[in-house]
């Protein structure tokens, strides 16, 4: 991590190094862009007495961001941090990706999900309704396959910014066959799902 502490680096105040074991290719960076992270070449991890950084800093960018004249924010990751998170599920990678999304969208997120476990969320829009797919990735097979058992997680609190003409007062849970009551305020629908075993689909109309 280089330069001043940016909002994207929130939560990493106690360190200047993040783990990485993926692919990264050198590239030329525009003069107006900011480089928040640079690559540290690999070094031995065993035996312990040799585990130290031979080259603690390079000019190889790992995370680049820019703000255009119209206010649009752009983040480019030469380092495949997203693929590393999908593969190894390291919390540091997940937190960094979360910060990147929040900064790029200026904290104007269309959905906020909170609760235990690892939940994959996909929000879709169709005429007259919004559909949220929730997949529970928390399992006994987190580090190996095949999946041994479902581990239900919950409660899951969900807050969705409603599209025009969507009331969002009574979300329908297609998998569990329930219809629940949501709290609708200032264009947001907030509700809670008690438990998700493997998959749930929420429909807002």
Tell where the protein language model's regions lie, with residue ranges.
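A conserved amphipathic helix/loop scaffold
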Residues: 1-205
């Amino acid at each position: 991590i280089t330069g001043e502490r940016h909002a994207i680096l929130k939560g990493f105040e106690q360190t200047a190094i993040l783990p990485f074991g993926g692919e990264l290719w050198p590239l030329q960076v525009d003069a107006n862009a900011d480089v928040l992270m640079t690559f540290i070449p690999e070094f031995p991890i065993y035996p312990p007495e040799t585990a130290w950084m031979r080259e603690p800093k390079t000019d190889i960018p790992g995370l680049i961001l820019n703000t255009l004249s119209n206010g649009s924010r752009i983040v480019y990751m030469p380092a495949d941090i997203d693929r590393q998170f999908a593969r190894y599920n390291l919390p540091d990678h997940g937190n960094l990706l979360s910060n990147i999304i929040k900064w790029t969208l200026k904290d104007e997120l269309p959905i906020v999900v909170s609760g235990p476990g690892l939940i994959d969320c996909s929000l879709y829009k169709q005429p007259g309704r919004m559909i949220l797919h929730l997949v529970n990735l928390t399992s006994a097979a987190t580090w190996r396959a095949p999946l041994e058992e479902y581990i239900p997680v919950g409660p899951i609190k969900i807050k969705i910014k409603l599209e025009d003409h969507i009331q969002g007062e009574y979300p329908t849970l297609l998998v569990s066959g329930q219809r629940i009551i949501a709290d609708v305020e200032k264009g947001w629908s907030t509700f809670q799902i008690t438990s998700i075993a493997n998959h749930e689909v929420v429909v807002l109309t």
